[in-house]
Amino acid sequence: MSFNGEKPKPIPESIKDPADMSVNRSNTTQARDILKQDEGGNMNMSLAEMEKHLKTLRLHGMIATLETRIVQANQGASFTEVFACLIQDELDYRKSRLTQTRLKASGLTEQPTLTEFDWGFNPKLPKMDIYELVSGKFIREGHDALLIGSPGTGKSMIAKTVANAAILAGYKVVYREAHTFFEDLFEATQLKRRKKISKLFSETDLLIIDDLFLRKKMPEQAADDLLEIILNRYSAKKSTLLTSNRLVEDWGKLLRDNTASSAILDRLLHHGHLLKFEGKSYRLKEAASRISQSKQKKQDEKGKNMDLSKEDL
């Protein structure tokens, strides 16, 4: 293995990606053999020693691909090519770990994408506006979004899709269903941790409150709690996305505080995107599909039983 500055041979396409390595022996065996051959030459450190030192330096991404990169070097890649690959491996590893950490911290339990969305079922949905939300442009601009419409029209799925896309883009996101949002604030107040949860809700890059007013009876402090967080986020130019099946004109009555409701909507709509969701319910569609499949299954089983009975005769 030589890193002496000679013109490197191109890395074969089949081994550029560690996942695509096509060799007769394992990378571990090859890497150890290569390093053993180099003893007394350019390299005096064993594979185990390299991994130990990389672990001390917490370069776990490099550890994961070290064996593959040694094989690549032996097959003609230059020092700079291999080292660049190792650096990129570490960066990719850290980005992946950070993304997983943020997904877990967000409260999001699923990762939907727009490729899963059935646009044909509800053709009246604001498709272009939805794509713009998922692009994250409104987060970069510090704007807000309200998704208003009938139950089952896709508001929650779009909200979760926006959350997932934002996390993958590197943003910190907090997703809460409305009742959980208010419960978190109430419990934190009782446990004297209000400041901590308020800071979390106020400072995250994107706060999503899903299904606001789904429950008819709102907590007594709902208006004050929501107003506090929205005012904090508005001042900090942090983006908030809310979904609800209730018209904004009804929010004052539902919150039992017209003044607070007006202040909340004033901030949300100042630089806000109001998307109306109209059409049929995706949930009812899925329920109808399940019922149909169940009926078909029963009919098929009944047919099989009849055939077996005829055979017995």
Residue ranges and their predicted role:
Residues 147-171:
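Walker A/P-loop
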